[in-house]
Design a protein with these regions (language model features):
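…primarily DNA-binding HTH/wHTH and HhH modules…
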Residues: 114-132
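Short hydrophobic/aromatic patch on the recognition helix
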Residues: 61-62, 66, 111-112, 116
Length: 132
């Protein structure tokens, strides 16, 4: 009876929408440095070698540990960041699509548009029109 009462009182807490997710452990120093490097340089060409040299790890080891700690590979992380920045810039009607692409590190507007559509299901122009 006591156990049933305990379970009944605990259920709302367990299924409460305010329950915090289990947090992931903090990133290692090297991966934190890699993330900072990417955030500081997302608007230019970033090579795996550049990041590995910056954090002092081999490229292959960096790739493995980065994925283990962040859950995504480095290229995906870079593209996720670039797409998030692009969305913000597209909401500002003062920039041409080409300028947005260049501002987030893409030299090729067509590739940028294809990747944007892959992420969001619409082209940058369609996205911009939808957020009027």
């Amino acid at each position: 009876e006591e156990l049933a009462g305990f379970v009944a009182s605990a259920l709302p807490l367990i299924f409460s929408p305010n329950t915090k997710e289990i947090s992931k452990p903090p990133l290692s120093i090297e991966i934190s440095q890699a993330v900072s490097f990417i955030e500081d340089h997302y608007d230019s060409k970033i090579s795996l070698t550049d990041i590995a040299d910056y954090v002092g790890l081999s490229s292959s080891y960096l790739c493995r540990v980065f994925k283990e700690e962040t859950g995504v590979n480095i290229n995906t992380y870079i593209n996720n960041l670039r797409m998030a920045k692009a969305v913000r810039l597209l909401e500002d009607k003062n920039y041409y699509i080409k300028e947005v692409a260049i501002s987030v590190g893409f030299d090729d507007q067509l590739y940028f548009s294809r990747l944007f559509k892959k992420y969001y299901g619409v082209t940058p122009s369609q996205y911009r029109a939808a957020v009027k």
